[in-house]
Amino acid sequence: MSWAAHQFEVYAVEAHLPKKMVGQVSWFAIFFGDFTPDFLAKFWVYGFNFHGKHYGATKPYQWHRGWPGMGISHTLFFGIMCCLGIWAWKHNRAWTIGFLLGFSAHVLTDVNDSIGTMLLFPFSTLNWSLHTWAYAATVKGGKYLDAASYYSSLGFMMDFFWLVVVLGSWRVLTRDFWRTKVVPADPHVWSWLGQWLDERGLLALYRSVFFYGVCRMIAWTTWAHVVARPMINGVRHHGYPWDLSWTGPWWVHHVSLPHVTPLIVLPAALVLLGCVYFVANTIWERMESGSIKAIAWRNVRRNTG
């Protein structure tokens, strides 16, 4: 799984919207789309202890990304179903497309760990994984071993990559970008929040996901390599050892699910990403007429009711 990368993705998607969608796609929808997969599945992955008993998934990796399990929450199919629900409910293209882009970013990023995601569900329940780093969520290790493994492997580089992408598009974090591109795409939500927050507060809220990601990355990396004193193979270490080799780190048990050959995963993920943007770009104009008709129909019903 990825950690701070999912926070940075939100701004990367916002900064690289198709030209016709700039200033018209909801930032909140991108955020909720990227947030949804782990919101639905991750709590039971780590579970919790109560009166000395652990409650959670017996096979966290199976529950999180597999089938049967909540692996469906990390499929493009599920994201599309959510988008259809949003469209049927509100006929709001800013939210429908924003959710689709955020959700897709999460699902496609998660092909990197040794479990991956079921990209072709429901046509196939095989996982698609690049095995870039080891998936490390376990019943005994919990989130601490998971974090230590991630921030000692190429997972750290994944977070760093997305951080660089956002910093390379630094204008997405500026007040001017927020005023001219973010607020106009979702005026009602920002206006509603403005009842309690002034402009500085609203801007801080917009930037908060990015700064949370930065703090999360720094804090967990510091804990894993400065604070922690793990016992590995009977040897006490001052911090978890770094291992930036493929499929690392070496000191974590490498788990996987039935999967396709890793050689086709990256090309397939890039093709699917291209398809998502192509479809979003293609239906964008048509959705506008659908929104206008839906609003007109709601007004008619309201007036006649």
Residue positions per predicted region:
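N-terminal membrane-targeting hydrophobic helices
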Residues: 1-305
